[in-house]
Amino acid sequence: MRGGGFGDRDRDRDRGGFGARGGSGLPPKKFGNPGERLRKKKWDLSELPKFEKNFYVEHPEVARLTPYEVDELRRKKEITVRGGDVCPKPVFAFHHANFPQYVMDVLMDQHFTEPTPIQCQGFPLALSGRDMVGIAQTGSGKTLAYLLPAIVHINHQPYLERGDGPICLVLAPTRELAQQVQQVADDYGKCSRLKSTCIYGGAPKGPQIRDLERGVEICIATPGRLIDFLESGKTNLRRCTYLVLDEADRMLDMGFEPQIRKIVDQIRPDRQTLMWSATWPKEVRQLAEDFLRDYTQINVGNLELSANHNILQIVDVCMESEKDHKLIQLMEEIMAEKENKTIIFVETKRRCDDLTRRMRRDGWPAMCIHGDKSQPERDWVLNEFRSGKAPILIATDVASRGLDVEDVKFVINYDYPNSSEDYVHRIGRTARSTNKGTAYTFFTPGNLKQARELIKVLEEANQAINPKLMQLVDHRGGGGGGGGRSRYRTTSSANNPNLMYQDECDRRLRGVKDGGRRDSTSYRDRSETDRASYANGSGYGSPNSAFGAQAGQYTYAQGTYGAAAYGTSGYTAQEYAAGTYGASSTASAGRSSQSSSQQFSGIGRSGQQPQPLMSQQFAQPPGATNMIGYMGQTAYQYPPPPPPPPPSRK
């Protein structure tokens, strides 16, 4: 039943607003704990204006589904429903949700054909005004699952008046995620003249305050900056009736629980609340119990910690000292791919800067992002990465959640994270939506405590498990592997294509270490040529292999580059190994003879010749100058970028 209230905005533009205007009038806070000036409001529901939040009309095709068909649809899409009263039937097409035509037009323009599993069940729940918890892997389409119902919700509320705060509030853990959500909100809200803003720390307050003062229906915010604005009276949440907690587990990991509780205390208790998370630990469960009323939990996939099944996960057990050499071998193969956008995750800001400096010194088109970077610099780096001008992004966990770049094909965990939850979110930066991707992980004995959890994640995703990883667990005292562990041990490669693939990946990770020819493909799904090569015994290193001395590939056996393979820099393998290649090749690669002597002391290329595609794609243009001066090293030559805009005065 629809609750009584204002109904459609077009019918009620003359109705009254939601209380006093202008904000709280509190003086700005300069010291103390965030949110200490905010007091929990005492709400009297009988005095609050009524509002409508149930707008769901079941489509006839959905209404005709029998209970058996509903169960079968949920089973096929791996949807599990728990709690609440009777849950609405899932939809299986966008038009079943009865969205307004302007929303359907945008969906069609973006070539969406059918809703994702989380959207199939999330749309009916959110449109019916119910509180809900959505548990799904990254890249599952949860942003649309709450934003499209939010647009419908807003358009059934009275118009904002001067001094009113937002109707829909989305809390996000990072500024990157907040910016991405706002972009989606702009794409779908502009057709209905809805305004949105994104407020986050690290950026000037002035433009954000002006947006709030002009009035926005949708506010996407990080907790810290929103607390600041609430305390200083720059905005209020009296009009907020639709609350979204996006990536709730991540916000708790980052220590935002006190701020979240302060913020929620400012919102009327009969609001509609939607919580989204990739994991379901006890801390998130407690938050749901405190903030949600009679909620329904929907889960897509396994209830345990799970990774995206579209990601091929490869774990290389190695020593800490081997990481640099293995990384360069890996990057040479990745950069030979047509689609090679890669994120490399490291543990600390210092290592992030150091690794970026060393890779750029040796010619890799790498840039970095971490929490100490200014907002203009972060925005510029992400734009360069998205555009493909710098296809290698080195990052700390600041980018492991919320960073949505559709065409990231590879993720490399240079340092294994502190928890399996962070591992799942890191590798979730690839294989967004229905795409496929590959994740490589360097796992050292120092990460032994996480071995069991990693094995569980691999087994759940039906991935092959590196025997060295199993040996680490056995050496520590067994356990954790379960039945899956014995299965991979006892099954032969001939009968287990997944394990055969893993064996081949291990062989290729070794690269030139064993003296074999370098390959120029990635470790992704095999083509028909690959399978035939493997089946007839030629393998990837055979003279008859598909990756032999062809045009566009270098010929290691002869030790010389052809002109077609390496442009004008035709120096020999012997010259490269000795560091004495000629001046002509040095000029074409944009390096000096002095920098060549430095090349082999850092994270330079492996003992093989440089990757040919790198010189073709990233050769120095005429008149180029250093790209970035902050590296503190002689950098590879690029066209100078436009400087980031100077921060405006607050």
From Swiss-Prot:
<keyword id="KW-0347">Helicase</keyword>
<dbReference type="GO" id="GO:0002376">
    <property type="term" value="P:immune system process"/>
</dbReference>
<dbReference type="GO" id="GO:2001014">
    <property type="term" value="P:regulation of skeletal muscle cell differentiation"/>
</dbReference>
<dbReference type="GO" id="GO:0031047">
    <property type="term" value="P:regulatory ncRNA-mediated gene silencing"/>
</dbReference>
<dbReference type="GO" id="GO:0005524">
    <property type="term" value="F:ATP binding"/>
</dbReference>
<keyword id="KW-0547">Nucleotide-binding</keyword>
<feature type="modified residue" description="N6-acetyllysine">
    <location>
        <position position="42"/>
    </location>
</feature>
<keyword id="KW-0943">RNA-mediated gene silencing</keyword>
<keyword id="KW-0698">rRNA processing</keyword>
<dbReference type="GO" id="GO:0001837">
    <property type="term" value="P:epithelial to mesenchymal transition"/>
</dbReference>
<feature type="region of interest" description="Disordered">
    <location>
        <begin position="583"/>
        <end position="650"/>
    </location>
</feature>
<feature type="cross-link" description="Glycyl lysine isopeptide (Lys-Gly) (interchain with G-Cter in SUMO1); alternate">
    <location>
        <position position="50"/>
    </location>
</feature>
<keyword id="KW-0804">Transcription</keyword>
<feature type="compositionally biased region" description="Polar residues">
    <location>
        <begin position="489"/>
        <end position="499"/>
    </location>
</feature>
<dbReference type="GO" id="GO:0000380">
    <property type="term" value="P:alternative mRNA splicing, via spliceosome"/>
</dbReference>
<feature type="domain" description="Helicase ATP-binding">
    <location>
        <begin position="123"/>
        <end position="298"/>
    </location>
</feature>
<feature type="domain" description="Helicase C-terminal">
    <location>
        <begin position="326"/>
        <end position="473"/>
    </location>
</feature>
<dbReference type="Pfam" id="PF00270">
    <property type="entry name" value="DEAD"/>
</dbReference>
<feature type="compositionally biased region" description="Basic and acidic residues">
    <location>
        <begin position="504"/>
        <end position="531"/>
    </location>
</feature>
<dbReference type="GO" id="GO:0106222">
    <property type="term" value="F:lncRNA binding"/>
</dbReference>
<dbReference type="InterPro" id="IPR046330">
    <property type="entry name" value="DDX17_ATP-bd-dom"/>
</dbReference>
<keyword id="KW-0597">Phosphoprotein</keyword>
<comment type="subunit">
    <text>Interacts with DDX5 in an RNA-independent manner. Interacts with CDK9 transcription elongation complex under basal conditions. Following cell stimulation with poly(I:C), a synthetic double-stranded RNA mimicking viral infection, the interaction with CDK9 is decreased. Interacts with ESR1 in an estrogen-independent manner. Interacts with HNRNPH1; this interaction is important for the regulation of alternative splicing on G-quadruplex structures.</text>
</comment>
<dbReference type="GO" id="GO:0031490">
    <property type="term" value="F:chromatin DNA binding"/>
</dbReference>
<keyword id="KW-0805">Transcription regulation</keyword>
<keyword id="KW-0832">Ubl conjugation</keyword>
<dbReference type="GO" id="GO:0000381">
    <property type="term" value="P:regulation of alternative mRNA splicing, via spliceosome"/>
</dbReference>
<dbReference type="GO" id="GO:0006364">
    <property type="term" value="P:rRNA processing"/>
</dbReference>
<dbReference type="GO" id="GO:0010467">
    <property type="term" value="P:gene expression"/>
</dbReference>
<feature type="region of interest" description="Transactivation domain">
    <location>
        <begin position="468"/>
        <end position="650"/>
    </location>
</feature>
<feature type="binding site">
    <location>
        <begin position="136"/>
        <end position="143"/>
    </location>
    <ligand>
        <name>ATP</name>
    </ligand>
</feature>
<keyword id="KW-1017">Isopeptide bond</keyword>
<keyword id="KW-0539">Nucleus</keyword>
<dbReference type="GO" id="GO:0061614">
    <property type="term" value="P:miRNA transcription"/>
</dbReference>
<feature type="short sequence motif" description="DEAD box">
    <location>
        <begin position="246"/>
        <end position="249"/>
    </location>
</feature>
<feature type="compositionally biased region" description="Basic and acidic residues">
    <location>
        <begin position="7"/>
        <end position="16"/>
    </location>
</feature>
<feature type="modified residue" description="N6-acetyllysine">
    <location>
        <position position="30"/>
    </location>
</feature>
<feature type="region of interest" description="Interaction with YAP1">
    <location>
        <begin position="639"/>
        <end position="647"/>
    </location>
</feature>
<dbReference type="GO" id="GO:0030520">
    <property type="term" value="P:estrogen receptor signaling pathway"/>
</dbReference>
<keyword id="KW-0488">Methylation</keyword>
<dbReference type="GO" id="GO:0003724">
    <property type="term" value="F:RNA helicase activity"/>
</dbReference>
<keyword id="KW-0051">Antiviral defense</keyword>
